[in-house]
């Protein structure tokens, strides 16, 4: 009996390792270990996860498959993960077969307590209805004007004074933290018309901002942990699950008060002539009757989408230009050239007010530099979907129903096959047409996926560029930034590509005298050439 049992166990082990050998040969990508699948490799490279994924994708021509659970009957379904950055596959997943690749139940369960069935956490008809409603608002000129108004006021009254105080005091400042505060204030103003004033002298603590951060952090931890584990922790009220519950109560109370007050104001606005142009008020005005809970989730979804993305992109942008002074000079000259034409030669007038929308629209090279930043350091480096039905990707990869698919936005911007041999270089010129008068090139959205693509492409893309260009131009005109000596700039491994240790910078005064003199000389030469060419007899 003991011998037969031993033989059965030995046969089972032998059969398992034969199966493991077979499955390992079928899956190209990181090594698959017994039971644990590719998790050991993931854990070993957790501090450089995005680059590790990129390395694997380069070695596998843009697509690989692995399993995170090397157990028969699971490895080719629930445990299988397809990872890709091939533009053909991205177009297939995000556009052509959009309905077959929803966010899926795992993603929705993780963020449900925070985002509910909001636009960024829903699929199907629920998502489509909210998307259509929001799309109508994001295409209006008044929303762009409202965004410009919030951004310019915050830049002038709070952001720039903080930078100036840091310069005068010769004290380093964490630019990433400051940008997070600024964009949080801006998106709150645009979303529900109230300024939490987190970006203010002294950098005050705001209870809503703190509660929102804690709720987001707790939700992200769920994404990392196995579903059964975080649900068990929630049931026992352990760790960040307790913090999530408390934070959500604070967030809900804060937003509930705003919604109640706003509805009362809107009922009397015809009498006092007061007008609200924030997103919350626009949704309240809709013919459809939204519950207060739905309005809260709408607001939270837009805040989550609009805060981190722009601030993270700007942090990497400012770091990159400190490493590339020639590009910084080119951006600055473009800004000054526009201001000479719109405000004249007086340098004092250039810094009197933040740039207008019309002036910002002319900053083609700045937009190119921001786009190049997002190509190399996308705010959301990886995203995932769940396959509803069996499918075959354009490159021939079979994707079984029930399996996960990760599309690497970070890797998509770093492939030689897509961007050329210089794909790892910071080169804004790749976004400028050399044969069409310096026009900005809108690259294929399935090559440049920083704003997503297909039906879920970012609605706030233009507003994001508006905000980033406003902030970047305001800083560059007034200050020169240098990274504090010895400060480490590393990626933080999270759903958003934060800098792990922030971005500590020293703030110096910007001297525009030389640029102004050069521009005046160029202007004078153009005038003289024009006069000379126009003389005839």
Swiss-Prot record:
Membrane topology label: Single-pass membrane protein
Subcellular location per the Swiss-Prot or TrEMBL entry: Membrane
EC top class named in words: oxidoreductase
Cofactor dependence: heme
Disruption phenotype annotation: Organ fusion between rosette leaves and in inflorescences.
Signals that turn on the gene: Induced by abscisic acid (ABA) and auxin. Down-regulated by wounding.
EC number assigned by the record: 1.14.14.1
Keyword vocabulary terms for this entry: Heme, Iron, Membrane, Metal-binding, Monooxygenase, Oxidoreductase, Transmembrane, Transmembrane helix
MF terms (GO), sorted A to Z: alkane 1-monooxygenase activity; heme binding; iron ion binding; oxidoreductase activity, acting on paired donors, with incorporation or reduction of molecular oxygen, reduced flavin or flavoprotein as one donor, and incorporation of one atom of oxygen
Binding sites annotated in the UniProt record for heme: 458
Catalytic activities: an organic molecule + reduced [NADPH--hemoprotein reductase] + O2 = an alcohol + oxidized [NADPH--hemoprotein reductase] + H2O + H(+)
InterPro entries xrefs: Cyt_P450, Cyt_P450_CS, Cyt_P450_E_grp-I, Cyt_P450_sf
Principal subcellular localisation of the protein: membrane
Membrane-spanning ranges: 3-23
Listed GO biological process terms: fatty acid metabolic process; lipid biosynthetic process; seed coat development
A Gene Ontology cellular-component term: membrane
Function, as annotated: Catalyzes the omega-hydroxylation of various fatty acids (FA). Acts on saturated and unsaturated fatty acids with chain lengths from C12 to C18. May be involved in the biosynthesis of cutin in the epidermis which prevents post-genital organ fusions. Hydroxylated FAs may be important for trichome differentiation, establishment of apical dominance and senescence.
Family named by the database record: Belongs to the cytochrome P450 family.
Name the record gives this protein: Cytochrome P450 86A8
The organism of origin for this protein: Arabidopsis thaliana (Mouse-ear cress)
Gene that encodes it: CYP86A8
């Amino acid at each position: 009996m003991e011998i037969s049992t031993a033989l059965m166990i030995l046969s089972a082990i032998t059969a398992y390792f034969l199966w493991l050998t077979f499955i390992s040969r079928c899956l190209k990508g990181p090594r698959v270990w017994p039971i644990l699948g590719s998790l050991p490799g993931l854990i070993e490279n957790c501090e450089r996860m995005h680059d590790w994924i990129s390395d694997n994708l380069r070695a596998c021509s843009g697509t690989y498959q692995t399993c995170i659970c090397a157990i028969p009957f699971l490895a080719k379904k629930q445990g299988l993960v397809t990872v890709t950055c091939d533009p053909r596959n991205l177009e297939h997943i995000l556009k052509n077969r959009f309905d077959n690749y929803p966010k899926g139940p795992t993603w929705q369960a993780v963020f449900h307590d925070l985002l509910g069935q909001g636009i960024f956490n829903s699929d199907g008809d629920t998502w489509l209805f909210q998307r259509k409603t929001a799309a109508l608002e994001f295409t209006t000129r008044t929303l762009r004007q409202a965004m410009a108004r919030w951004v310019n006021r915050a830049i002038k009254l709070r952001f720039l004074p903080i930078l100036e105080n840091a310069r005068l005091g010769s004290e380093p400042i964490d630019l990433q933290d400051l940008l997070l505060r600024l964009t949080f204030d801006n998106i709150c103003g645009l979303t529900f018309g109230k300024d939490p004033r987190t970006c203010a002298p002294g950098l005050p603590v705001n209870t809503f901002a703190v509660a929102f951060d804690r709720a987001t952090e707790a939700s992200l931890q769920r994404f990392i942990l196995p579903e059964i584990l975080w649900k068990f922790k929630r049931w026992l009220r352990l760790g960040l699950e307790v913090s999530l519950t408390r934070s959500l109560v604070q967030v809900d109370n804060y937003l509930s008060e705003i919604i109640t007050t706003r509805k009362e104001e809107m009922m009397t606005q015809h009498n006092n002539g007061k007008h609200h142009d924030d997103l919350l008020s626009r949704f309240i005005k809709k013919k459809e009757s939204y519950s207060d809970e739905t309005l809260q989730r709408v607001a939270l979804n837009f805040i989550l989408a609009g805060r981190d993305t722009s601030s993270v992109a700007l942090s990497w942008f400012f770091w990159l230009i400190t490493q590339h002074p020639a590009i910084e000079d080119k951006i600055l000259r473009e800004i000054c050239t526009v201001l000479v034409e719109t405000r004249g030669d007086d340098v004092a007038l250039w810094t009197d007010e933040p740039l207008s929308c019309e002036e910002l629209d002319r900053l083609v090279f700045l937009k190119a530099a921001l786009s190049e930043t997002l190509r190399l350091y996308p705010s959301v480096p990886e995203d995932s979907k769940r396959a509803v039905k069996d499918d075959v990707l354009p490159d021939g990869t079979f994707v079984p129903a029930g399996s996960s698919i990760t599309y690497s936005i970070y890797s998509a911007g770093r492939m030689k096959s897509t961007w050329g041999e210089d794909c790892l270089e910071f080169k804004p010129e790749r976004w400028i047409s050399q044969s069409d008068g310096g026009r900005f090139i809108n690259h294929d959205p399935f090559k440049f996926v920083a704003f997503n693509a297909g039906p879920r492409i970012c609605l706030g893309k233009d507003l994001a560029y508006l905000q980033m260009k406003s902030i970047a131009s305001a800083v560059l005109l007034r200050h020169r930034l240098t990274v504090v000596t010895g400060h480490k700039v590393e990626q933080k491994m999270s759903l958003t590509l934060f800098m792990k240790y922030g971005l500590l910078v020293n703030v110096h005064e910007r001297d525009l005298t030389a640029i102004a003199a050069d521009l005046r000389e160029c202007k004078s030469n153009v005038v003289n050439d024009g006069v000379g060419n126009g003389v005839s007899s």
